[in-house]
Amino acid sequence: DGTHIKANANKNKRIKKQVKIITDKYHKELENEVNEFREMNGRDKYPSDDDDFGDGNYTIDEKTGEVKEVKNKNSKEITVSTVDPDAGLFVKGEHERQFAYTAQVACDKNGWALGFDLNPGNMHDSAAFLPFFDRLQPMYHASIWCADAGYANNLIAHHVQNNNCHLLVPYTRPKGATTTFSKREFDYYDEIDQYRCPNKKWLIPWNISKDGNIEYKIHKTDCGDCPFKKECLKNYSFKTVTRHLYEDCRLVANDFRLSEIGKTIYPMRKTTIERLFAVGKEQHGLRFTRFIGLEKNHNFLALLLACLNIKKLALLLVKRERKLKNKLTSIA
């Protein structure tokens, strides 16, 4: 699981900074598979997000004659703290923003902390998980990774299952507007890779987005005399259904969630990782940082989790000693 730790930085002392977007190796693998899919369907490859188009181009406004800079599409503007530049701006709620760090922590079924990672607060849990998983999996060879809904996406499910593990995540509601004829009303046929609509017409794969979402479209003539046209199409001329390239992996994770093992293991989160965070925040200062900089806070978190493991061991030894003492007393 991941938790945010408030940074020792004033949120009003900040500047705007332009940074280059760098594609990680996991999204590059997805990008390669997307381009392979496009080549199979006779389409050109997508340009890589890492292609360097320079620091920006300039254009002249024809009306005013003003020279304007065109921002590079492969860069984005972020908010950086002048007090702690390593921290990231975390959007806590609708109106609350603060500089923070996000900690990724893994524990076993008994609540022992096994590993951790610390990142800027503006990094989502799903983005921080994959390198964290690759570092811990060779050490512990876990067969099941149980996480909250923030880790429930197709890319994570694909990567975890490729490493011979199960991803156990909770149910998440479908995103988007509620419609009468949603995606679940369309039957998918894996053998021919096509969807069938309630009117028994076929939707064929038409295109694929850079994110890996395949678009299935129906011919306009098939929608012309459809009795469900008004409810199904709304303001569109033909129906489109999307399916991710790794959606099969997500369905496997969903089936594992509904299995007896999944129903038994998932409730253990509240007594393991959630309890670990609760004890750390309420009793040992995990809610706020005392240092400035990623390295110092990383070292503090390592010491804190080590102390929590030692505390857990000490309590178990005391408990065992009391049981032994009571047993000897009853015998005497």
Residue ranges and their predicted role:
Residues G2-A332:
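Anion-binding and metal-coordination hotspots
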